Amino acid sequence: ESARLASSSDTGEGHPGGAFQFAALLEALAGMMPAAKPLEMHLVGHSAGAIFHSHFVPELVHRGLSAASLSVLAPAVRNDVFKANVAKFVGKAPGIGALTMCTMTEDAERDDDLVEFLGATVYGKSLLYLVSRAFEPKRKTPILGLEETLRADPVLWPLFNGGGARLELSPARGETPNPHTRALRHGCFDNDAATMRTVATIVTS
C-alpha cells in the first residue's frame, strides 16, 4: 500500500501522489538550470523502489525530461508494469539513457531463506518469490527481478540479453562470484559493496 501511494500519480483522495509531485519538482529545477549545464538525473531503486520508478519514469517523460541512467536492484515490480511504463523508454529521449539490473540467479533466489523462526526455515525462498506467489492477485505473477520469469518474457529478455540493457546476476553460494554484484539475500543489495561500486561507476561515468 505504501509503495502504491508513493508511486501513483494520484493517491485516490484528490491529492497528487509521490511520483507526480517529485517529477513536477524536478521539472521546475530543470527549468532553473543553465543551458550549458542541464540537470543530470540518475535513478536507483531497490526492491519496491522499482515499482516507484515504473510510475515515476512516465511522469518524467511526460514533462520532456530524461534520466541518464536507471539502476534497479532485485526489482519487485511486475513484468507487465515495467514493460508498459519503462522498457519502451530505454534509449529514447526523453527517456532512460542506460538501464541496469542487479539481481540474483534463480538458484540464489531459492537459497535465500526469507523467513526463519527459532532456527527453523518458515519460508525457504526469497522475498521476490513470496511477492510472485502470494502478494499479487494472480499466483506466480512474473516479477522483473526473478531470473526465471525474466528469461521467459519475450520482450524483457531480449532487452537484457544484448538489447541495450545491462544484467548483472549474483550467483548462489559456492559458485564463482560476480564482481559487479555479490548480494546473496534480497535485502542485501543496497549495502553490498560490489553492487554499490557498480551503481557508483554508472552514476559517475
Please place each PLM-identified region on the residue numbering.
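Short, hydrophobic alpha-helix immediately C-terminal to the catalytic nucleophile
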Residues: S54-P58
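Gly/Ala-rich beta-loop-alpha elbow adjacent to hydrolase catalytic centers
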Residues: L43-G49, H53
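Lipolytic serine-hydrolase domain surface
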Residues: E1-E40, E59-S205
